[in-house]
Every structure is written in C-alpha cells, then in structure tokens.
Amino acid sequence: MKKVILVSIIAATSLMAASDKQIEDFYSQMVDSSVKVKVADRHKVAGDIEAVVVKLSKDGNSQDEIVFTKGDFIFPDVIDLKEQKSYLAEVKKEVIAKGISKIYKDEDKANIIVLGSDPKKPTIIMFSDPECPYCRAELAKIETTLKDSNVEIVLTPVHDISSLQKSSLIYKDAKAAKSDSDKVKILRKYYAEDYNVDDKSVSKDDVAKIDNLRKKYFAAGVRSVPFIVNKSDLK
C-alpha cells in the first residue's frame, strides 16, 4: 500500500468526491465576486484521489489553482512518500505543459536556440534567463545534459531590462552560430555575472520583442526559470 500524506484545508466525509459545484462554491467564498470560478479539469492521480484544476478569471486574465479531493475533503497537495513526489508539482507541470503546447508548436524558430539534433535522444525545452543564477547553473552543465538529451532554449527573463537586452543580443548572435559549441559560447558570454550591457546596443523595439515573448509564456503558465519540460509532454 502506498504511503501518502494528505494535507487538509477543509474537512467533511463522503463516499463520493466533492462535486464541481462544491469546489467552485468553496473558491467563490474566498475571492472577489467579480472573479469567475470554474472547474476546468479533474482526473484521478492516486487511488480515489482526484486532482482538480480550478480556473479563476477576471477582465480577460486567468490563473489556474490546483487542489485534490477525496470524499468531501479537499487538499492543497498529496505527497507520495514511497515515490518521494508531490502530486501538486506533477499536476502543475502537466497544466503548464498543456498551456505551452498551444503556442510552442507555432513559435518562431528564431526564438528557439536548438542544441543537439540526435533523433535517438529525447528533447527537453528549457525556459531560461541570462541573469538567473539557477539558469547559469543549468548552462554550466549543458555539455553533460546534451549527452542524454537534445535541448531547445527559449529566453523568458524574469529580471529587469538588462536581462531583456542580454536575451535580445543572444538571439541576434545565435543566428550566425555555425555549431552547438558556438551557441554555448554565446550563451556563456551573456550569462556571465560580470557581463554588462551597453544600453545603446539594443533598441527599444528589440527589448519589446523579448518582453512580448516572455509575457506570452508567462500567460501560458511559466512562472519561474529555469523551467524545464519534456517536449514529448507537449500534446
């Protein structure tokens, strides 16, 4: 039998899972009356426990909340001790992958830095930022990553204007790269902590293009970087 921790935020008992209406009513009590609450998806994740995706919408903007239900209980997360995994993290990734897939398949190739092209290897998509320390750590081990996977990088900086400028320069220089090693050198040049951008080297229009690119993926669910997803999960 799996060892599972259920972290409860409300409690009652029932043999059937909480209905969509019960969950929508629960959320409606916690948000402004102008926010539309709708159960967007639900599916079983462990035994009789269901993951429920709740969409909160207002003025054309929306965000997804994830809860778990069994009977009339709902939980913010379910942790499988045997597998050492959080179902919340897993379902979040599924939801984000679904959102990304709708736009990534039509993404301009100029916005994707491709490293590796081995058809026998899986491909990972990495959303990154030249000023993010964890992104720098991923780049530091990129040669090791490429031994097992092809990598497609999209720059979605979460930092200020200098990170947008660096991203623009990376894309500009990457166009002329003749090999993966050239692309990695370009990435490392602009990811270096001591690299300072000359404001005159990047136009406001080019900065705006990167800003629009990142906003598109933020809207799809990318909330932090590095964010890595298997390309095969984009369905």
Please place each PLM-identified region on the residue numbering.
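Intrinsically disordered, low-complexity boundary segments flanking structured domains
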Residues: 9, 24-28, 139-141
